[in-house]
Amino acid sequence: MSVEAASNSSDQSGLKPFLAKYNFKLGEASDEYIARRKRQMVLFMSSAALTIFASRFAYKSTISRQYIPTLFQGNHAPPLSYNFATDAAVAVGTGTLLCGSVSSMVIFGSCWILDVSNFKEFGWKMKSMMGGYEKERELSKLPMDEESAYIQDGLNDILEGKYDFDEDGTEEGK
């Protein structure tokens, strides 16, 4: 047993009695479930920290570019030594950083709330939340219309090898 695994198991063993003492449902959960929820929490907290860093960076870069005129200088004309291309590049980069960090925070927070760890689980969760299983059962009970049955039979014939592509059914020689 490695040192990391030993420290993790001792950490988990100290956590379970605490959770059970205060009647948390998580106290009855398995170690894998607790580790999974911990990973989801760490992802969310990391993206939240990145969002805080990005917003602070955007604030500082905005304040540093603010035009403050001297005492007897007009406040309507910016200085002539101003580089608009650099300002635009910094604005695009800062906006992209803010958008990405806030989006990651929303996504990881939603996944933490919904207990989703991968794309397959996300698909299952969305299908069950939107009533996909019930609607699928209702659709399977409905009778199939004539055109859909014809297309389905044709596709089944192709998949089973019953259809000959060389023979098109028309007589070209006559």
From Swiss-Prot:
Top-level taxon: Eukaryota
Keywords noted in UniProt: Membrane, Transmembrane, Transmembrane helix
Entry's family note: Belongs to the AIM11 family.
Membrane topology: Multi-pass membrane protein
One GO CC term on file: membrane
Record carries keyword Transmembrane: yes
Compartments where found: Membrane
Primary gene name: AIM11
Record-given protein name: Altered inheritance of mitochondria protein 11
InterPro entries: AIM11
Ranges annotated as spanning the membrane: 42-59, 88-110
